[in-house]
Design a protein with these regions (language model features):
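A detector of single, family-specific signature residues
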Residues: 1-204
């Protein structure tokens, strides 16, 4: 497509008509230094669209992670320091199952340890240490935290959103890898692999 200049720079008029505008566009096309748009290939367009959607989903996910942390700071503040990230699978599974400090304190010890072992896969010692930390955090939260039913509802709601975003983000990453793998011989993919060789540059 032709890149045309703003019509207000050519003539000032109150009434616009097709005859004048078409003539102006034709005159622009006669210029020897005419610039035209460079249309990317379908492969580049697909990669660009998926990358944009990936980062958009990541931004939305981060917003719900912040909301989850905000709720926990009020209802269960000591829980935030137990795991490396509050959004790892073990942490989210525990919060989905019990959510409130009182629920953790009432829960069966072995049940919590089994959940930690099955999701973290670091062994019994790790699971027991995390259990002790959670119980201590729950005990402290009963004294310093403040939780009502709406906090529990929102914590579980935010976790469900985070899990859904994780699912869609992983789906987009899989699609990107499939797209690249299917076009290994193209110059575009070769350029991607070249960029990946730079220190600090990843797949995206």
């Amino acid at each position: 497509p032709i890149i045309t200049k703003n019509s207000t720079n050519i003539n000032i008029r109150k009434v616009h008509n097709d005859r004048f505008d078409s003539k102006k566009a034709a005159l622009v096309g006669l210029k020897p230094d005419l610039k035209v748009s460079l249309m990317p290939s379908d492969l580049a367009l697909n990669c660009r669209n998926l990358c944009r959607e990936y980062y958009d989903l990541m931004d939305n996910r981060s917003a719900y992670v912040n909301k989850l942390q905000g709720e926990l700071r009020i209802a269960f503040p000591q829980y935030l320091g137990i795991f490396s990230k509050v959004t790892i699978n073990t942490s989210l599974t525990l919060l989905e199952t019990y959510t409130s400090p009182s629920a953790f304190l009432k829960a069966d010890k072995q049940e919590i340890i089994d959940i930690i072992k099955s999701t973290a896969r670091f062994g019994l010692t790790y699971a027991q240490n995390k259990y002790n930390a959670i119980i201590q955090a729950a005990t402290d939260a009963n004294q310093f935290g403040y939780i009502i039913d709406s906090n529990i509802k929102r914590i579980r709601l935010y976790i469900s959103f985070i899990r859904k975003y994780d699912e869609e983000i992983n789906s987009i990453l899989e699609s990107l890898h499939e797209l690249v793998d299917a076009n290994e011989d193209s110059d575009f993919v070769k350029q991607i692999h070249l960029i990946e060789t730079f220190k600090g540059a990843g797949f995206l």
